[in-house]
Amino acid sequence: MFYKNEELVSILPLNIKKSFLKILNWNGFPFSDYNQPILKTNYHLKLNDFKFIISQLREIVKFDNIHFINNINSHYLDDTIKINNISYQLMFTRNEQQHNIIQKLKNKIKYEYRKLKINYNLEINLNPTKHEKKDILNFFITQKTKQLNRTNAWNYLNINKYKKNINNLLEYNNKNITFSCLKIENKIISAHIGYIYNNVFYYIFPVYDNDYKKYSPGNILLCKLLENCQTENFKSFDFTIGSEAYKRKLNNKSCEIIEYISSETILGYTYYFLIKLKI
């Protein structure tokens, strides 16, 4: 916590990751698509403030490196930064731009949507009950595990504490967490779990059953979510980080995501140069 003139103006949610060295980083991995300090309204953390906070931390705990990923701004950081990702948003303004973007997606999935409606009893649920939310969670864990294994990606769901964090979403504030799904014959074939905050819809955990990929169930559900956000006068639909093709097509705004790394010890320089070679 950072105070100025005896007033709390900023909280930095940090932790130290311990491996062969100690790394100061943001809390929330692997679920934090965006990272930044929590700031008092109208207060802006400056570089000198940040340096002072780090100097005070050094007096309390030792660490070899500072490594901040997924920073959505960098005004309080020095020039030891690297643009390493992009986030995309669809802003809902009063012009026709976002309407045209959504309409293009609607036209793209029109054939698959019609085939599903003809061949199956189709249901799209944007307001599930608690029991239905549990079904969505189970579907997400099952299908996400299959997807990560299929693509040889790191499966964070194999780690109990991360899997527990997903399951705990049922217990959090219903106003801020949103569940939705697409069903055929009462069977879920695509789902999404995300967040709503300050009238922004955050598209976080989309997943679909690969056996029904030819019907584009993920895109059909996404289209319904976009239409609903537009109808409900959301400020924006945030696709968060990632350079997937569909995000590049469905946005009217993008933001640079920053990675910051610095070394505090000789051992830390080894880590620093390894990361620099990687990025």
What are these regions (language model features)?
Residues 33-36, 120-122:
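Short amphipathic alpha-helical segments
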Residues 16, 72-102, 231-279:
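Active-site/acyl-donor-binding loops of N-acyltransferases
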Residues 65-67, 124-125, 236-238:
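Short catalytic-loop micro-motif centered on adjacent basic/acidic residues
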Residues 1-24, 71-76, 81-87, 96-214:
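A conserved beta-strand-loop-helix scaffold within acyl/acetyltransferase catalytic domains
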Residues 3, 32, 49-51, 55, ...:
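Aromatic (often tryptophan-rich) hydrophobic motifs at membrane interfaces
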Residues 35-44:
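The substrate-binding groove and active-site-proximal loops of carbohydrate-active enzymes
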Residues 21-33:
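Cytochrome P450 substrate-recognition site 1
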Residues 44-93:
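Non-catalytic accessory segments adjacent to catalytic cores
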